[in-house]
């Protein structure tokens, strides 16, 4: 990240596993032994230390444990991405570990719309069933770092932290109670915290939150094919440059209809989320209003994605096969333009609406 320091060059001094051992042992001696301070060494990087169990053990087994030495590890075997597998370095080795969790993912709206991921990080996603909760209950990790905000470089910029707070509250309370308080109990505590008025509101807020997790899987990622996870990030909706390899795979495996159906399923889910949001009342009118506005925001975002994705995929399919589905493409273009107009009106008419996405990448 040296883009603002044009005359500087960033480079790591760590090139081998043994380099890690030398560095960590120096830090351990200077910080833990000589000064009796806490040392938290973050494993995040692209060389394997963060995601390879053999790499991790090869380094850490050569370092003597210390009560004030911790290793910090993301819960994903990659960046904080929905389709990333559970990190295999968690719960292994001799050293105490801190697990990192992100409440505001830059690839998934940054809190601009519902995105409840804490439950599935704890109990397992449909496509990635490993469960962090079991490690917490067995006290195999020493604690958690929660990125309550942050992630990414730009927008959307939010006017209310509700959805970031939900993920942060559930995860922090679960680790604080060492798993002896269930996710469901903690979720109900959050409903009380935001002043939901009645059982119907609590029930609808629960359904809405759980549905958001599935909706983002189908709207942004896929359960059927590999996709460039970074085709959207921050407030940018990427295009054919980011999705060409994905489209090649979809076409080669005859999954065009499946791919479009996933996006349609996501939009139907968001329609249900909007319906549920209109039947949720909080004693705090700002909260009630934001639930409605942010749910509409999510609907427009993923409806736009569905149409844009369809236009690009069907257009690319036409280039490959020389057989264009012209009427479907025209219909999606008309819907795409209309949805963008309505999305902009949502922002113009609501002061608490997050800043909008842009129809292009960085």
Residue ranges and their predicted role:
Residues 1-14:
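Active-site groove signature of glycoside hydrolases
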Residues 14-362:
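Substrate-binding groove of N-acetylhexosamine-processing glycoside hydrolases
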């Amino acid at each position: 990240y040296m883009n603002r320091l044009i005359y500087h060059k960033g480079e790591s001094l760590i090139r081998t596993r043994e380099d890690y051992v030398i560095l960590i042992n120096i830090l351990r001696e200077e910080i833990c032994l000589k000064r009796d301070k806490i040392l938290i060494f973050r494993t995040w990087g692209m060389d394997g230390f963060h995601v390879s169990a053999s790499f991790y053990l090869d380094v850490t087994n050569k370092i003597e444990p210390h009560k004030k030495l911790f290793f910090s590890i993301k819960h994903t075997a990659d960046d904080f991405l929905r389709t990333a597998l559970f990190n295999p370095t968690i719960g292994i080795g001799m050293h105490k570990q801190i697990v990192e969790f992100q409440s505001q993912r830059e690839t998934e709206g940054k809190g601009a719309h519902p995105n409840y991921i804490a439950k599935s990080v704890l109990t397992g996603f449909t496509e990635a069933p490993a469960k962090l909760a079991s490690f917490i209950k067995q006290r195999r990790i020493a604690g958690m770092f929660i990125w309550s905000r942050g992630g990414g470089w730009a927008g959307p910029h939010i006017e209310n932290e509700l959805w970031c707070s939900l993920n942060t509250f559930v995860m922090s309370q679960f680790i604080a109670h060492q798993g002896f308080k269930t996710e469901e109990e903690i979720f109900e505590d959050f409903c009380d915290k935001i002043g939901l008025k009645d059982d119907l509101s609590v029930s609808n807020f629960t359904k809405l939150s759980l549905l958001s997790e599935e909706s983002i899987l189908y709207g942004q990622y896929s359960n059927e094919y590999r996709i460039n996870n970074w085709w959207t990030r921050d407030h940018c909706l990427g295009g054919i440059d980011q999705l060409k390899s994905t489209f090649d795979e979809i076409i080669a495996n005859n999954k065009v209809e499946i791919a479009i159906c996933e996006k349609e399923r996501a939009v139907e889910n968001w329609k249900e989320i909007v319906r549920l949001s209109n039947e949720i009342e909080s004693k705090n009118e700002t909260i009630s209003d934001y639930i409605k506005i942010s749910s509409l925001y999510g609907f427009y975002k993923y409806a736009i994605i569905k149409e844009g994705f369809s236009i690009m995929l069907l257009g690319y399919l036409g280039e490959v096969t020389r057989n264009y589905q012209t009427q479907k493409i025209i219909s999606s273009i008309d819907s795409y333009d209309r949805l963008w107009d309505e999305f902009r009106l949502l922002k113009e008419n609501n002061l608490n609406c997050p800043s909008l996405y842009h129809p292009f990448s960085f």
